[in-house]
């Protein structure tokens, strides 16, 4: 795939399911995910191609990723137009996207899709994987979690999701359900809403959106202290903005402040709502807009349960002790055997206002199909906040109304997929509306400019790539064409070999002719 794009083939895809015998549901499910983030996506081949043939996980993954593909169609279409105009492929290798980062030169496990989405497809039997993020801020597509670039991270890769990260300063046109205003949800024809997914920039960044081959909107994201502004060079008609990974304290549209709501904005109202740190949902007034300014609010919550005291009924072996699920590591686990009495409880150390719990199960292992989550202020009197009745055994993200609690307990576990259950991580998160005492361990989004991984190092010894400015006749745009140095080297070597071969052939022909003439004379 990366070789195809480097050779100029921008429009490609795979026959999901294949013509050979797909071995199992996990391969098929991972293939679905990869196809979602390819220039075109289709199920095609021989044998059973229908997702429901491969079990509930595959079927549910197909449904969520089918709607995600529908969400992203405007962005994919725009990228295809850009590819046609400039030659810049829809899917790019990391080396092509970030030529200034030598660590990404040989990266084959991740790539950029439509310039804004870093995709790390899973090609092995894994529930977590390592990913190297270029400099700048990155936001998890599924959770909104902030990752600071320039480092390698061990990230979740449950069977129903592939790791995808949104780049800082992104402005992504999407279509979402007007009922939920969320990605991956079913879009009914009478409730489709055009929206923009945006992320806080590092310094300043521009994005082009081609709604058709002749109509272009340029969005500019620029940071100023703890505020950033998204401006358009022409009136934007999108009425919904999904600001990922942002807990906004103020939002202004064309300079006018919007009301902060305590609920998801309805179709007939304007305002903004902070959706538990995952994103801020903004519904703008009916009029077209040219600028939206977002002021960052409180800290982004980290896992309050990490390295906290955990109490449980038992554990199976020393290498699967219960402390493993709150140690912040993804390669340590806790396996529970006696489910009739299984529970675990985490002491947060102090009373917190929480509204989200995450329970992460190991793929292809036993998991908690049914269980309850309860909270307590004193460890004795418990209040149930969530009852899980049909978990799929991957990552369960459980949301509930904000509640004050010091202790969080998971109990009444029944197994799915075996007689034991294995957990590798447990998380508890503070509500976005919680008051803090200033000791929050969360992180603020740093929007300062970073060293640009997109810039080619100014050195004659660079083996990354050369950069030349090209003006294409008939196009109003000046764009940059990146030429892989190894392609040039191979071209030169190939040319030399071709010339040498031609010379050798000429010499050989002359020798044969000389021998023939000599024989005729004799």
Q: What residue spans do the PLM features occupy?
A:
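Predominantly extracellular/luminal regions of secreted and cell-surface proteins
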Residues: 182-202, 300-327
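Single-pass type I membrane protein transmembrane segment
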Residues: 487-498
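Catalytic-domain carbohydrate-binding cleft regions of carbohydrate-active enzymes
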Residues: 1-160
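Catalytic cores of secreted or luminal carbohydrate-active enzymes
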Residues: 66-86, 124, 141-217
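Surface-exposed beta-strand/loop patches in extracellular or lumenal glycoproteins
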Residues: 125-135, 232-249
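Single-pass type I membrane-protein transmembrane alpha-helix
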Residues: 498-511
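Cytoplasmic C-terminal tails of single-pass
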Residues: 513-522
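Aromatic, loop-rich ligand-recognition surfaces of beta-strand-rich domains
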Residues: 300-302, 327-386, 390-446, 466, ...
């Amino acid at each position: 795939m990366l070789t195809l794009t480097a050779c100029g083939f921008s429009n490609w895809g795979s026959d999901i399911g294949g013509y050979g015998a797909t071995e199992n549901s996990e391969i098929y499910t991972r293939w679905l995910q990869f196809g979602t983030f390819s220039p075109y996506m289709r199920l095609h081949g021989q044998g059973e191609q229908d997702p429901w043939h491969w079990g509930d996980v595959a079927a549910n993954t197909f449904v969520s990723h089918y709607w995600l593909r529908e969400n992203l169609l405007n962005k994919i279409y725009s990228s295809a137009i850009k590819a046609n105009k400039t030659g810049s492929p829809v899917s790019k290798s990391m080396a092509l996207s970030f030529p200034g980062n030598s660590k990404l030169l040989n990266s084959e496990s991740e790539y950029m899709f439509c310039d804004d989405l870093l995709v790390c497809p899973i090609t092995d039997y894994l529930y977590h994987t390592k990913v190297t993020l270029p400099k700048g801020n990155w936001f998890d597509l599924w959770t909104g979690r902030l990752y600071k670039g320039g480092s390698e991270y061990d990230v979740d890769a449950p069977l129903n999701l592939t790791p995808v990260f949104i780049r800082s300063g992104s402005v992504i046109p999407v279509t979402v359900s007007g009922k939920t205003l969320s990605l991956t949800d079913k879009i009914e024809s009478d409730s489709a809403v055009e929206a923009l997914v945006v992320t806080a920039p590092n310094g300043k960044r521009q994005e082009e959106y081609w709604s058709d081959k002749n109509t272009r909107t340029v969005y500019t994201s620029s940071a100023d202290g703890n505020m950033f502004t998204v401006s358009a060079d022409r009136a934007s008609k999108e009425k919904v903005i999904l600001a990922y990974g942002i807990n906004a304290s103020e939002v202004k549209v064309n300079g006018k402040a919007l009301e902060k709501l305590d609920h998801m904005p309805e179709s007939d109202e304007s305002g903004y709502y902070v959706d538990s740190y995952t994103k801020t949902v903004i519904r703008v007034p009916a009029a077209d807009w040219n600028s939206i300014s977002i002021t960052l609010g409180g800290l982004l919550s980290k896992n309050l349960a990490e390295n906290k005291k955990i109490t449980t009924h038992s554990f199976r072996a020393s290498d699967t002790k219960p402390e493993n699920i709150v140690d912040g590591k993804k390669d340590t686990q806790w396996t529970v055997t006696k489910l009739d009495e299984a529970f675990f409880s985490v002491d947060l150390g102090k009373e917190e206002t929480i509204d989200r719990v995450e329970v992460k199960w190991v793929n292809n292992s036993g998991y908690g199909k049914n269980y309850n989550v309860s909270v307590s202020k004193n460890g004795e009197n418990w209040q149930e906040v969530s009852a899980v009745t049909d978990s799929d055994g991957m990552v369960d993200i459980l949301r509930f109304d904000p509640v004050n609690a010091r202790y969080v307990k998971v109990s009444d576990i029944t197994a799915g997929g075996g007689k034991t259950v294995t957990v590798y991580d447990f998380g508890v998160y503070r509500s976005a509306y919680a008051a803090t005492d200033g000791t929050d361990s969360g992180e603020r989004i740093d929007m300062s400019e970073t060293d640009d991984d997109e810039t080619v190092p100014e050195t004659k010894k660079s083996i990354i790539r050369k950069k030349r400015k090209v003006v294409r006749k008939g196009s109003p745009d000046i764009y940059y064409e990146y030429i892989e140095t190894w392609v040039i080297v191979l071209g030169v070597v190939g040319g030399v070999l071709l010339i040498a071969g031609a010379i050798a052939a000429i010499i050989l022909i002359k020798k044969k002719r000389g021998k023939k003439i000599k024989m005729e004379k004799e």
